[in-house]
Regions:
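Conserved, well-structured functional cores that handle cations and Mg-NTP chemistry
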Residues: 1-177
Length: 177
């Protein structure tokens, strides 16, 4: 008698929940609106699903390939080309996805008189051990009151007082060290 591994069951649950999320929020339509089109080979959604699942499986893409050989139908170059494509508007994708989640899930649960706000946060993204990273800057952290090396991460979030949903983010730096 063979026992079923816990990781197999959790991966199946994860896959089902991801499929539900992708269908409910029409991620394929949002990807198309962000100019993510198939040029050749595999559909864009299948590449996105693999990238999305590796994050929630807490593995790198490299480990995913080695742990499950033959399951992923493309090479790592395909994923890296997809993620680094200059034609895909990733900010439009994250903003549209956040708006869809807010309109279809969060807004019906809250009352109409509740005030919605946009929160703009600029935190320091520390890269203390890095020396030769492009555009690495010496920044002053106002919370810790000290200088450190890193980037300024500007984050836009939506909130209704109880729920906080990140809408978009960007890393900022200066060319002056």
């Amino acid at each position: 008698m063979n026992s079923i591994a816990q990781t197999n069951q959790s991966e199946k649950q994860l896959s089902e929940k991801m499929q539900y999320f992708l269908r409910r929020y029409h991620v394929s339509r949002i990807l198309r609106s962000a100019n993510a089109y198939k040029l050749r080979g595999l559909p864009v959604l299948s590449i996105f699903i693999v990238a999305f699942s590796t994050i929630f499986a807490q593995r790198s893409f490299f480990m995913q390939i080695h742990l499950q050989p033959g399951v992923i139908p493309f090479a790592k170059d395909t994923l890296y080309r997809f993620m680094n494509s200059c034609h895909i508007h990733w900010r439009r994708f994250t903003t549209t996805l956040a708006a869809t989640i807010i309109q279809s899930t969060i807004a019906p649960l809250t009352s109409a008189d509740r005030v919605n706000v946009l929160i703009l946060d600029d935190s320091v993204y520390h890269r203390a051990r890095s020396k030769k990273v492009e555009l690495l800057a010496r920044l002053y952290d106002h919370a810790k009151k000290e200088f450190s090396y890193g980037f300024r991460m500007l984050t836009l979030c939506w909130s209704d007082g109880n729920t906080l949903l990140p809408v978009n983010h960007t890393l900022l730096s200066t060319e002056n060290p």
